[in-house]
Amino acid sequence: MPNFSGNWKIIRSENFEEMLKALGVNMMMRKIAVAAASKPAVEIKQENDDTFYIKTSTTVRTTEINFKIGEEFEEQTVDGRPCKSLVKWESENKMVCEQRLLKGEGPKTSWSRELTNDGELILTMTADDVVCTRVYVRE
């Protein structure tokens, strides 16, 4: 199993604002979120092969999640709505998470994290058919 642990810095981002728009985030909040998310600090701690802590810090907000592969947990969608999430291994180097809103209606959301052979961490976030890709390297 790969080790996702480390402090990660972003090197590339595609479609982040488009994904926020698909989630219904208004233009003013999108501009703030895009600026804040341009340099997130991401810390991942992995215990054994299946227990994770992920902290993402920006100038606007910090999120922390703790989860075990295969066990449902509560978190928030990227636009802050409460949801139930379930993470599974899709391959040896890639975890995928399906999210289910706790209240209300909204686009179907999910995320995945994959370690590449050259050491990059690829975060993919989806809102219905809009896909955002963010690429990180270890600091």
Curated annotation (Swiss-Prot):
Positions of short motif Nuclear localization signal: 21-31
Binding site residues for all-trans-retinoate: 134-136
Localization per record: Cytoplasm; Endoplasmic reticulum; Nucleus
GO terms for cellular component: cytoplasm; cytosol; endoplasmic reticulum; nucleus
Xref: Pfam families: Lipocalin (PF00061)
Keyword field contains Nuclease: no
InterPro entries named in the record: Calycin, Fatty_acid-bd, ILBP, Lipocln_cytosolic_FA-bd_dom
GO molecular function: cyclin binding; fatty acid binding; lipid binding; retinal binding; retinoic acid binding; retinol binding
Post-translational modification: Sumoylated in response to retinoic acid binding, sumoylation is critical for dissociation from ER and subsequent nuclear translocation.
One GO term of the biological process aspect: positive regulation of collateral sprouting
Cross-link (Glycyl lysine isopeptide (Lys-Gly) (interchain with G-Cter in SUMO)): 103
Principal subcellular localisation of the protein: cytoplasm
Family: Belongs to the calycin superfamily. Fatty-acid binding protein (FABP) family.
Domain notes: Forms a beta-barrel structure that accommodates hydrophobic ligands in its interior.
Stated role: Transports retinoic acid to the nucleus. Regulates the access of retinoic acid to the nuclear retinoic acid receptors.
Oligomer and partners: Interacts with importin alpha, RXR and RARA.
Protein's UniProt name: Cellular retinoic acid-binding protein 2
